[in-house]
Regions:
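PLP-dependent enzyme catalytic core of the Aspartate aminotransferase-like
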Residues: 59, 63-67, 71, 94, ...
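N-terminal "arm"/small-domain region of PLP-dependent enzymes with the aminotransferase-like
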Residues: 10-11, 15-72, 203
Length: 396
């Protein structure tokens, strides 16, 4: 039977290749950090990791992971409700809830699972999910698994969101769903305005904080702190795989009864192995660090402001904002790939993003700033961008 599928796949892969959309993986042979080594021994500066706070290889985080490995083992060989819940899992759930200002938290193997498993247990045909059109793929897939009515509002458009709320007033429950920060643009959701509309139209609010937890807001609690609406968000999903250590694991945090129901009925939680003890222990250490000081968050903010200012002065078209995701717009997919390849030659590791990850004609280099970057790293990146940009005719 594969003889019939094989030529179809070969042709489709060839089409992807010819369109300049084929994705190739670069191999890294070192720990994650601002300075990394790629296969072949080349040392480069990394500007494309979600390592916002530089904690992926932080000595305290590694030490905590090793300690948990020794004290609680390598794995649990079980889902949570059978024999997969250790004291450190409950401790981490409590710490996340305290950090975010919520009532309770449930852990998942990945943030994709958190978003994939949140809607179906809570909503049915009588309800409506009103989602930003640029929400993460995991939210889109999670909504597809649910029988609730689906409404998409135009990206970051409060007028269109209000129209969708008016159109669904007959529904039993309605929930507004948005990314806290959108991963391709670095746009921060207007959560204050969303909460105002939610109160006006009696709707719930859910945010995915994967690109915010740990550094958005004055103390890094997230978008809800940034917009001064802590306590008004019903569901917060997020990841341990970006700013909060960078390994893997996800969570859903929010109202007590919501979390209780997810423990009973959320399929990714019920049918996936528990989070590894080493990740759990390391994540506890991360939250302790971030609760004690905002030094890393503050440095990230300084680095981001500096890079955004300098890359703009160099003549590049970037998406405006304050987030450490800095999209350098190139528009053409093949140009984005060539640009990224030449940047690697200059010792700067960045990736070109293009369709289907971003819309057709919106190809870009997505730069991601880290607290682990020093000014020397940032200046080298600006110099490389300028050199390559001039060589390829992107800037004058």
């Amino acid at each position: 039977m594969y003889n019939t599928l094989k030529p179809v796949l070969q042709q489709e892969l060839a089409d992807i290749e010819s369109a300049g959309l084929y994705k190739r993986e670069r191999i890294i042979t070192s720990p994650q950090g601002p300075d990394i080594t790629v296969q072949g021994g080349k040392n480069v500066i990394n500007f494309c990791a979600n390592n916002y706070l530089g904690l992926s290889s932080h000595p305290k985080v590694i030490a905590a992971a090793k300690e948990a490995l020794d004290s609680h083992g390598y794995g649990l060989s079980s889902v949570r409700f059978i024999c997969g819940t250790q004291d450190i899992h409950k401790e981490l759930e409590k710490k996340i809830a305290e950090f975010l200002g919520t009532e309770d938290t449930i852990l998942y193997a990945a943030a994709f699972d958190a978003n994939g498993g949140v809607f179906e247990p809570l909503f049915n045909e009588q309800d409506a999910i009103i989602s930003d059109e640029l929400n993460h793929a995991s939210i889109i897939d999670g909504v597809r698994l649910c029988k609730a009515q689906r409404q998409r509002y135009k990206h970051d458009d409060m007028a269109d969101l209000e129209e969708k709320l008016k159109a669904t007033e007959s529904c039993r429950h309605r929930i507004i769903v948005t990314d806290g920060a959108f991963s391709m643009d670095g746009t921060i959701a207007q959560l204050d305005k969303i909460c105002t509309l939610a109160e006006q139209y009696n709707a719930l609010v859910m945010i995915d904080e994967s690109h915010c937890s740990g550094f958005m807001g004055k103390t890094g609690r997230g978008t809800h702190e940034h917009h001064n609406v802590m306590g008004k968000i019903d569901i917060i999903t997020g990841t341990l795989g970006k700013a909060l250590g960078g390994a893997s694991g996800g969570f859903t945090s929010g109202r007590k009864e919501i979390i209780d129901m997810l423990r009973q009925r959320s399929r990714p939680y019920l049918f996936s192995n528990t989070l590894a003890p080493s990740i759990t222990g390391a994540s506890i250490a991360v939250l302790n660090m971030l609760s004690e000081t905002t030094d890393l968050r503050d440095k990230l903010e300084t680095n981001t402001q500096y890079f955004r200012k300098k890359i703009t002065e160099a003549g590049f078209d970037i998406k405006p904002g304050i987030h450490p995701i800095v999209p350098v717009m190139l528009y053409d997919a093949k140009l984005a790939q060539e640009f990224a390849a030449k940047m690697l030659d200059e010792g700067i590791y960045v990736i070109g993003f293009y369709y289907p990850v971003v819309p057709q004609g919106k190809a870009r280099i997505r730069v991601q700033i880290s607290a682990a970057h020093e000014m020397e790293h940032l200046d080298k990146a600006i110099a490389a961008f300028t050199k390559v940009g001039k060589a390829l005719g992107v800037i004058k």
